[in-house]
């Protein structure tokens, strides 16, 4: 199938960030926001080379005059035209490759609608003329990256979180739980609680500022009630943040109230279990004989697991749910923001994987539905 001298491309299209690079590399070459921006004002200066749309970092840097849209929501592509722009940008501007010369590995969230991966497959073969492609489940790749074959992965990105138990390399589909609560919801919640403090953030561009505040200052409290008392009685937890216009805002309990929603989704008006309960429920759906191995190999992955304090809090919460003698280990690799991509890089460069690719020929014979037969 693929010649050995042609490196496969690995593209992890997240709801928030797109990570792209070459199989065999230890980190993605390109990481940029999964954003397409369109001007919201009339261009008046001729010869400025104004475009009708901007992608990624360029959209981010011109955000003040653009309306920003994320074509991927909750891990599902909602706007295929914009998605095509992002892929085009990935291949031609970021990686500078001809997509028709390289096999491409894409990633997706589990329990996604079937039509989503069929359309991905169709665009890769028909628009970009890929010689071969494959769609892998994000959490499975994170486990590859951690060097394990057994464990439960809590993968939480910008659009979707999911827990996937894997035993000896087999994913257990009946025990996968998907939670549509992730980083973007926390950004929205942060916008809301900052409004209560008298700071107003409304536009799509201002949301990006709030996302930055969240990423730089938020953390997970080990004991939420205790932390709330500390915040109320002293200013030790307050931090200041400088907005792009030089104005300085101060945030206090918002720093840990925001990610607390991961453990208490009721904060967002969501009627679902928190990430700790979801992980526990996922383990409980597995056979009693393998639970011990899952408790001892709970792997965190994705950008929304980057909050300081999250691993200790997970350890505490799961310990109180699990049987008292159970050994619980939360693994939080420092590079977990990119572990899905890293796992993809490992997978696509394995010699045993080379017969797994869907080739252009197979696609021409069977159509887009081949993706369900050949990809887990």
Swiss-Prot record:
InterPro entries: Actin, Actin/actin-like_CS, Actin_CS, ATPase_NBD. It catalyses: ATP + H2O = ADP + phosphate + H(+). The keyword Kinase does not apply. GO terms for molecular function: ATP binding; hydrolase activity. SUPFAM superfamilies: Actin-like ATPase domain. It is found in: Cytoplasm, Cytoskeleton. GO terms for cellular component: cytoplasm; cytoskeleton. This is Actin-1/2. It comes from Podocoryna carnea. The gene is ACTIA.
């Amino acid at each position: 199938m693929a010649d050995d001298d042609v490196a496969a491309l690995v593209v992890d299209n997240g709801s928030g960030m797109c990570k792209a690079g070459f199989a065999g590399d230890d980190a993605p070459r390109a990481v940029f926001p999964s954003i397409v921006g369109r001007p919201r004002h009339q261009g008046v200066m001729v010869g400025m080379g104004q475009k009708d749309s901007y992608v990624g970092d360029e959209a981010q840097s011109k955000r003040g005059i653009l309306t920003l849209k994320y074509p991927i929501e909750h891990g599902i592509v909602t706007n295929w035209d914009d998605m095509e722009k992002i892929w085009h940008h990935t291949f031609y501007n970021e990686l500078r490759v001809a997509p028709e010369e390289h096999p491409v590995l894409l990633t997706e969230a589990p329990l996604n609608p079937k039509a989503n991966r069929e359309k991905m497959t169709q665009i890769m073969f028909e628009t970009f003329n890929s010689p071969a492609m494959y769609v892998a489940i994000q959490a499975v790749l994170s486990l590859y990256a951690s060097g394990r074959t057994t464990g439960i992965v809590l993968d939480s990105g910008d659009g979707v979180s999911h827990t996937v138990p894997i035993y000896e390399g087999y994913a257990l589909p009946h025990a996968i739980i998907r939670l549509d609560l992730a980083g973007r919801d926390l950004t929205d919640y942060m916008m809301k609680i900052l409004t209560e403090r008298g700071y107003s953030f409304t536009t799509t561009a201002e949301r990006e500022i709030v996302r930055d505040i969240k990423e730089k200052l938020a953390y997970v409290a080990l004991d939420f009630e205790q932390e709330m008392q500390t915040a109320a009685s002293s200013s030790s937890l307050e931090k200041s943040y400088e907005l792009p216009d030089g104005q300085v805002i101060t945030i206090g309990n918002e720093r840990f109230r925001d990610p607390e929603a991961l453990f208490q989704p009721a904060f967002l008006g969501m009627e679902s279990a928190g990430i700790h309960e979801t992980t526990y429920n996922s383990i409980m759906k597995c056979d009693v004989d393998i639970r011990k191995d899952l408790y001892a190999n709970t792997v965190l992955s994705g950008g929304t697991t980057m909050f300081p304090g999250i691993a200790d809090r997970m350890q505490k919460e799961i310990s109180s749910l699990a049987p008292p003698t159970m050994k619980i280990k939360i693994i939080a690799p420092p590079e977990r923001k990119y572990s899905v991509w890293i796992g993809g890089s490992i997978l696509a460069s394995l010699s045993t994987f080379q017969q797994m690719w869907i080739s252009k020929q197979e696609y021409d014979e069977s159509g887009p539905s081949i993706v369900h037969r050949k990809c887990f």
